[in-house]
C-alpha cells in the first residue's frame, strides 16, 4: 500500500504588528541590498537589486536600488510598519534613490544615518583602474 504524503512542518511566516523599525541600505558599485528590521534587529523584509530581477551591471543602477527598496517597503508595510530609521552604508549609486523610494512607498523616515565604515589607514586599497 502506498504511503500518504506527509506535510512538512516548516515555519510559516506569521504576520506581526511592528509599527517602527530600521532600514539598512547597503549600496555598493555592483548591487544594492535593502533590509528592514524591527527595533531588536530581527529581519522583517529584505530585497536586493538581484532579487528584484536585475542582472549583471544593471544591479548597480539607481533604478535597481529604487525597485529593491519599494519591494522591501511593501512587505514591511504589510507587517504593519509605519516609521523607520534609515542606515545607509557604502559608496554606490543607489543610496539617495533607495531612501526616496522608502519614503514614496508610505514609510515615515525619522532618521537618516551614514554608517559607511571608514578605515583609519587600515588595509591598502586596490590599485587605480587604468582604462
UniProtKB/Swiss-Prot annotation:
It holds the Pfam family Ribosomal_S11. Signal peptide: none annotated. GO terms for biological process: translation. GO terms for cellular component: ribonucleoprotein complex; ribosome. One of its GO terms (molecular function) is structural constituent of ribosome. Gene3D superfamilies: Ribosomal protein S11. Keywords: Ribonucleoprotein, Ribosomal protein, RNA-binding, rRNA-binding. Transmembrane segments: none annotated. Part of the 30S ribosomal subunit. Interacts with proteins S7 and S18. Binds to IF-3. Located on the platform of the 30S subunit, it bridges several disparate RNA helices of the 16S rRNA. Forms part of the Shine-Dalgarno cleft in the 70S ribosome. NCBIfam families: PRK05309.1, uS11_bact. Belongs to the universal ribosomal protein uS11 family. This is Small ribosomal subunit protein uS11. It comes from Nostoc sp. (strain PCC 7120 / SAG 25.82 / UTEX 2576). The gene is rpsK.
Amino acid at each position: 500500500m502506498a504511503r500518504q504524503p506527509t506535510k512538512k512542518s516548516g515555519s510559516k511566516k506569521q504576520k506581526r504588528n511592528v509599527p517602527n523599525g530600521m532600514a539598512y541600505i547597503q549600496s555598493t558599485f555592483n548591487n544594492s541590498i535593502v533590509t528592514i528590521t524591527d527595533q531588536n534587529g530581527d529581519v522583517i523584509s529584505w530585497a536586493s537589486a538581484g532579487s528584484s530581477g536585475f542582472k549583471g551591471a544593471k544591479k548597480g543602477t539607481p533604478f535597481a536600488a529604487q525597485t529593491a527598496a519599494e519591494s522591501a517597503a511593501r512587505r514591511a508595510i504589510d507587517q504593519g510598519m509605519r516609521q523607520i530609521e534609515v542606515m545607509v552604508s557604502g559608496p554606490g549609486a543607489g543610496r539617495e534613490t533607495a531612501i526616496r523610494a522608502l519614503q514614496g512607498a508610505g514609510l515615515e523616515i525619522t532618521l537618516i544615518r551614514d554608517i559607511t565604515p571608514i578605515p583609519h589607514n587600515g588595509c591598502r586599497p586596490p590599485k587605480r583602474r587604468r582604462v
